[in-house]
Every structure is written in C-alpha cells, then in structure tokens.
Amino acid sequence: MSQIHSFIPSNASPATLGISLILCGFIVYSVSKMFGYRTNHFPVEGRTIVVTGGSDGMGKAVACQLAEKGANVVIVARTVQKLREALEAIKGTAQDVKKQRFHYISADLTDAAECERVIAEVTEWNHGLAPDVVWCCAGYCEPGFFVETPVNTLRSQMDTVYWTAANTAHATLKSWLAPIPPSQQVPLPQRHLIFTCSTLAFVSIAGYAPYSPAKAAIRSLADTLSQEIEVYNGARAASSRNAAPPADVKIHTIFPMGILSPGFDNEQGLKPQLTKELEAADKPQRPIEVAKASIQGLEKGDYLITTMFVGHMMKASALGASPRNSIITDTLTSWLSSLVFLQVIPDLRKKAFNWGLKNGVPSSQSK
C-alpha cells in the first residue's frame, strides 16, 4: 500500500484526483481505439451465418456487411416479400456472388419449434453442417409508460424481444453442443452466438417499461451462457475426452442506441414526450454505422459491444459481473462513468418530476 500512496501527492484534492481519473479514462479509451487490434477474432469469409431480423434495419445492414466480407448468409424474418427484397440487396454487396450462397427463411421466432425448424433447414441447406454464426437481431420496440401500457403489450414485447432471441439461442446451442465421438471430430473454427440488446439494459429511461426489461433479460441470459458455454469448451479441451461438441463456442452481445429505421419511425410515434426529452443525448445512428461498429467489436473479440461513446459510458456504469473486454480500459472507464452518473441519474429523476409537475398524470393525450 505504501508504494501506491507514494504516487499520490499528499496535497491532492478530490477534485484533482477526479479530473486526473477522467483524463486517464479518456487517454486509455482513445489509445485503445487508435491502435485497435491485431488479430481478427471474427473471420467470416466462406462461413455460413444466420441473421434473424435480417429483412430490414440493423439486421439487413449486418447481413450486407457480412456478405461484403465473403460470408454465406441466411436471413430470417416473417414477411416473405421483405425477405426477397433484402436478399437481392445482400447479394448486391457480396464479395464474390458466384462463390457465396444466400438464402432466406420465413419464420415466427416467438415459436420455439419454428426456431428449431430454421436451424434444421439451414443445416440441410449448408450440406449437413450447422451454421458457423447465429446473430439474433429480431425484435421491435413499443415504448410507453408502464401503467398506460396494456398488459398484452408487455407480454408481446417480452415475446418479440426476449423470446425470439432465447428460442433462437436454445435451438442453436442444442445443435452446436450435441456431443460427437472422437472418431468424428475434426478441427473446426470457433462458432459465435451473438445477441442484439440495447443500452437500455444498462441505463433504463422512463417510457421504455414495455421494452427495457426484455432487453435486460437478454443481457442476463448472455452473461449466464458466457459461463455455461465454458463447460462445453472445457469438455472439448480435455486431453482424454470421449464425446464432446464439435467446436468451441463464444457468446457476444451488441448494445446499440437509437437506430434510424422504419421501426424507429414507428417507435417515435408511440414514444411519450418525456422520453424524447430524457434521451435527447441519444443521436440515432444509421443501420450501416451500427453494423460496422458491431462487426469491429466482434473482430476484436469483445464480449459486450457498444456502438458509440455514450453507449460505452452507459455500459461502464453497469458492468456488474459481466466479463470484461479489457480489464484496464473497462475499469478506468467504469470509474469515470461512476462520476458522470452521479449527475445523470438524479437529473433524469428531476426531469421526470418536473414533467409531471407541469403536465400532470400521464395519459394517451400526453404522447
């Protein structure tokens, strides 16, 4: 302890220490962004990738960028016409359309049996091999005050946000983790299961009561799976193993903020005015920007991936027991965010109080 104290001036004030900490956080964050990474932990060329919710918005942008990098892409959504149109756009971005393969599947992912059908169909289409990557992008947001929202909407949001992801993950992992005997085991690259969450899972905002809990549930599921998956990875690593899964698996979660899309336009029409005021700092990104930042995070090997600096600060404020991307960067940024959110959280509550003081009890007329 004496060595640590020797680095701290005896007359340093709390303000000085706080400013120094903030500067350190910004320096570490900037350096990490400047120098990036050397190893690509997410090579996709020649690999088969399933993107749910791939007919528009972020999912479509993700599929296009993966195709541009040489992946074989399967998109999943409900509406056949939108899937057909999206698939043509995805083919148009392909690195080599003659070598790559593309497919779409219409399915209702709130039904677990449909998710199992999707994985089975992709496996058959992929010459009997399970997909290498499954990226869960399905879901939409219906904002509103909790008491003003019908209970069936609360349930619907859990179905379309959480259960589409959980059902897809369950079907995928059942396929990936089925043990095979040593005689059938061949070297396979690491597989990736990717969830798409929201920064609202870190810091929720009034008006997102139907949506935020479902996203928080995804984050919790991903954290749990990041531990459970190591049981299967460990079984593969055993020197005297018997039956084991055919490949290691890694879990990732993406945390975008606002995304400019048809779904966002619909969301804005439902959103309480208070919510719009509280999230004024959230500058929506284009789907292509979110997809690019997400893929860059995957290529770095990150577990929790945010797509802009504000989201990074929100993540740092709520790391909890989640695995860190970088012990040093995440720790310093969490110290910085703890100072920032000493101001932010009371400010959000104060604005909500003042909004009620001015507008009265929320109702459908206040939207």
From Swiss-Prot:
GO BP terms, alphabetized: 3-keto-sphinganine metabolic process; sphingolipid biosynthetic process
Known pathway: Lipid metabolism; sphingolipid metabolism
Active site: Y211, K215
Membrane topology: Multi-pass membrane protein
Residues where NADP(+) binds: Y211, K215, I259
Catalytic activity reported: sphinganine + NADP(+) = 3-oxosphinganine + NADPH + H(+)
Protein EC: 1.1.1.102
Residue numbers binding NADPH: G53, S55, G57, R78, K82, D108, L109
Similarity comment text for this entry: Belongs to the short-chain dehydrogenases/reductases (SDR) family.
Function: Catalyzes the reduction of 3'-oxosphinganine (3-ketodihydrosphingosine/KDS) to sphinganine (dihydrosphingosine/DHS), the second step of de novo sphingolipid biosynthesis.
Record protein name field: 3-ketodihydrosphingosine reductase ksrA
Naturally occurring in which organism (per UniProt): Aspergillus fumigatus (strain ATCC MYA-4609 / CBS 101355 / FGSC A1100 / Af293) (Neosartorya fumigata)
